[in-house]
Amino acid sequence: GKVWDWIKKTAKDVLNSDVAKQLKNKALNAAKNFVAEKIGATPSEAGQMPFDEFMDILHYY
């Protein structure tokens, strides 16, 4: 719904901010590992997924 779209848009903006870039790698690695585990892929495969698909998996699990 609209709320989820807003969260994704905001997440994109936040992830692109300078402050976030310092923290992003740790968070992204944790998210990649999580997504990879859920879909049975390797973290590097999970990292190559489109952002929206990646966020959908985080959302639905």
From Swiss-Prot:
Q: In which tissues or organs does this protein occur?
A: Expressed by the venom gland.
> Where is it localised?
Secreted; Target cell membrane
Keyword list (alphabetical) reads: Antibiotic, Antimicrobial, Cytolysis, Fungicide, Hemolysis, Ion transport, Membrane, Secreted, Target cell membrane, Target membrane, Transmembrane, Transport
Indicate the residues removed as propeptide on maturation.
45-61
Cite a GO CC annotation: other organism cell membrane
Read off the InterPro entries from this record: Antimicrobial_7
Pfam families named in the record: Antimicrobial_7
Q: Name one GO biological process term.
A: defense response to fungus
Q: What family name appears in the similarity comment?
A: Belongs to the non-disulfide-bridged peptide (NDBP) superfamily. Long chain multifunctional peptide (group 2) family.
What this chain does, per the record? At high concentrations, acts as a pore former in cellular membranes and causes the leakage of the cells. At submicromolar concentrations, degranulates granulocytes and has a weak hemolytic activity against human erythrocytes. Also strongly inhibits the production of superoxide anions. Has a strong antibacterial activity against Gram-negative bacteria but is less active against Gram-positive bacteria. Also has antifungal activity.
What is the protein named? Answer: Opistoporin-4
Upper taxonomic classification of the species?
Answer: Eukaryota, Metazoa, Ecdysozoa, Arthropoda, Chelicerata
